[in-house]
Amino acid sequence: MSISASLVKELRDLTGAGMMDCKAALAATEGKIEAAVDWLRAKGIAKADKKAGRTAAEGLVGVAASGNKAVVVEVNSETDFVARNDAFQELVRKIAQAALSTDGSSEAVANANVDGKTVTEAAKDAVATIGENISFRRSAALSVPQGVVATYIHNGVADGLGKLGVLVAIETAGDAEAAQAFGRQVAMHVAAVNPLALTSADVNPEAAEREKAIFIDQARQSGKPDNIIEKMVEGRMRKFYEEVVLLSQAFVINPDLTVEAALKDAEKAIGAPAKITGFARIALGEGIEKEESDFAAEVAAAAKG
């Protein structure tokens, strides 16, 4: 089949692999991007930690908390300039507050009440005053029956607003202030490391099987016997889980400890057993690719208009 230049560019952007390698990968996988990424990884050409997607949308992520519940929302705009607009920031705050009265699902938040309108309607109405297309994109919420939900905003532009928001739920009957302090540290860790799951049991089985298949292909290239290959794959899968599972990861604040060990250590200050029951992480524009504009063409078009 014919492999287009745009497909090769997309694969290069995703993997950092060379043009000829990308062409070969696409030819071997009938032009399927995801399969081509796996093909390159199996050959040792692409790294697993290369992000499969680019972030390009603008706007803000906002967090809000009340009692033992917290929410994180994402509201998109067309330019970063609008993200610094007071009216836009106030809208994001109101949407985050409205989200607290819901279960946190994107559908529920879209229909939540903001000044007598739904969130979706409020975002549309803001277009007239702010001058750009505004849209509520997604949300998440966490709560605990007893304990705290810590929040963290990275690259903050105002209180509770920034480019990346994280929630971490800690269930405990102990000191709330100490639990909050530790929860915020874990939230900072989640912001930096971006774990896939809380525990190994929570890892998507398809994702785990996909990694295993890649490791098997890589191990077979060593030419070693099957029993050695099996042990090699077991070791690599163990390392995979250590890298993507929150509780098993080396704690960013103290890399000598895993997050789980750091939690046990934090129980001394909390004064009671504590358990991380969940986390949520929303990065602005994650999974959205904004169309790149040709500035010269825009100027020429404006001059003609």
Swiss-Prot record:
Keywords: Cytoplasm, Elongation factor, Protein biosynthesis. Pfam families: EF_TS (PF00889). GO terms for cellular component: cytoplasm. GO terms for molecular function: translation elongation factor activity. Residues 79-82 are annotated as: Involved in Mg(2+) ion dislocation from EF-Tu. It comes from the Bacteria. The keyword Protein biosynthesis applies. It is found in: Cytoplasm. Its main location: cytoplasm. The keyword Ligase does not apply. Belongs to the EF-Ts family. Associates with the EF-Tu.GDP complex and induces the exchange of GDP to GTP. It remains bound to the aminoacyl-tRNA.EF-Tu.GTP complex up to the GTP hydrolysis stage on the ribosome. NCBIfam families: tsf. This is Elongation factor Ts. It comes from Brucella canis (strain ATCC 23365 / NCTC 10854 / RM-666). The lineage of its organism: Bacteria, Pseudomonadati, Pseudomonadota, Alphaproteobacteria, Hyphomicrobiales.
